[in-house]
Amino acid sequence: QDWKEALKSAASNVVDKATGGKATETLMIGDWQYEAPGVKLESDNALADVGASAVTGKMEEQLEKLYALAGIRAGACKFSFAADKRFTATFGSRTFTGTYEFTGESHDIALHFEMSSKYDLGTLNGKTYLSGTDLQILFPATRLLKMVDVLGQKLASFSTTAATVSTLVGKFDDLYLGFEFTKQ
């Protein structure tokens, strides 16, 4: 991350805090293209944060492999949020629609997926953060892995990669995994 990106990120955080999260709610409306896995540890324990940062790179690498097997990769995954609280999510060749609720100060988001004939994603509760021009949508690690499993192909390589990620995830409480997007 260069200094310009760091400055944008800091500025967006200041504006978001000053507006009680309303800036994120307003600025998240639009089309977002998937870029990379998102990983965040919510903890007040500095030692745990250091431990988490040590495995974040490996976790992101394994998530990227797992996501690719489920059709989630750059250029093939996007989210669109509308002002009327509806969203469209595309994972590879699969498109899902639904509604969302966003709570500004806590950054909580609830994605209510409409029922599909093949997939039942239900409601996903997570967190949404804007950092400069990037959007992060994160979910409790175990819930995200269940969603990816629903989308994933039943291949041996999927199961092996999922097991590796699950092992890494099991080492941390309050771990959020998800997606990083850039605005289209």
What are these regions, as identified by a protein language model?
Residues 1-83, 88-90, 94-97, 104-184:
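Lipid interaction determinants
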